[in-house]
Amino acid sequence: LRYSVDLAAVMPAPLKDAAKAMAYIKDHADEWYLDSRYVFVSGFSAGGHLAAALSVFWDNEEMFPEYKDNFDRIRPAGMILGYPVIDLKSTARRLDIGIEGYPDYDKINFGQVHPNVDPADIFVRENNKTYVNFEIAMNAYMFGGYPTDEQIYQYSLQNHVTDTTPPAFIWHGGEDGLIYPRNSFMFAEALREHNIPCELHVFGKGGHGLGLANEVTENNPWEVNEQCARWPKLAADWIKSILRQQ
C-alpha cells in the first residue's frame, strides 16, 4: 500500500490516491466477491476531508480527467465521516496544547510546522502562554505552504456539493475544540440544499479524535465516551437504510 503522506501529501495528490483506491477495488470486485455498486468511503478528521472530497469531486472532469470515460469507477456509494474537516476556515486558531511561556520555536514539541511556513505565524504568544494556530498549520500541509484564497475555496467542500454527491453519515463530538462541529453542520446543510440523503449526529459530549470512542481506540481516558461510541451501530443502520432505497 503506497500513498501520499507528510510533505508529499499536497492536494490533489491524496485525492488522486483515494480515486485510484476506489477504482482498484471496483476493478477487482468480481475477483474479491464484492458488489461494486456498494463501495462506501469513510474517513475521520483530515481523512474525513479526503473522503468527502472524493464524494463531491468524483464526477468533476477538471479534477479527474483520467476517469472521464467512466466516472462510476471512482464514485462512492456513500460516505461515513467522523469529525471531518470540511471548511478550511473552521479550525482552531488559538489551540492550547499546554505550552507555558514563550519558548524558542525549535524547542516546542509540535510536529506540524511546515518548512515553508514561518513558525511565528503558527505559534501565538500571549498571556505568558504559547498557542497554536492550527488552521495555518493544517492548511500548510494540504497545500505545501501558505494557501491562496482560491485554494481555500476550492477545498472547502461545502462549496462543491452537487445533485450527484452521494449520501452521507456524519458524526461529531459537540466539544471538539480542534475541528469545530460547524464543519459537519455546514456540510449537512449543503447536502440538504441539494436533496442528498444525510444523517448527522452531533453528540453533546466528546472532543476530537475519538475513533471508536471506546477502550479499543483510546489513548486517553477522555476518549472513552458512551454517547459517541454509538456511532458504528448508527452508521451500520444508516448503510442498511441507504441500500434499501437503491
PLM regions: where:
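C-terminal catalytic histidine-bearing segment of alpha/beta-hydrolase fold enzymes
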Residues: A168-W171, P181-Q246
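Short beta-to-alpha linker loops that shape the active-site pocket of alpha/beta-hydrolase fold enzymes
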Residues: R2-D6, V85, G204-G206
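Mobile cap/lid helix-loop segments that gate and shape the active-site cleft of serine hydrolases
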Residues: R94-H160, P166
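Short beta-strand/loop motif that positions the catalytic acidic residue
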Residues: T164, F169-H172, D176
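Acidic catalytic loop of the alpha/beta-hydrolase fold
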Residues: L88, E175-I179
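Catalytic nucleophile-loop/oxyanion-hole region of alpha/beta-hydrolase
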Residues: L1-Y38, V224-C228
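Primarily recognizes the serine-hydrolase "nucleophile elbow" in alpha/beta-hydrolase
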Residues: K20-D104
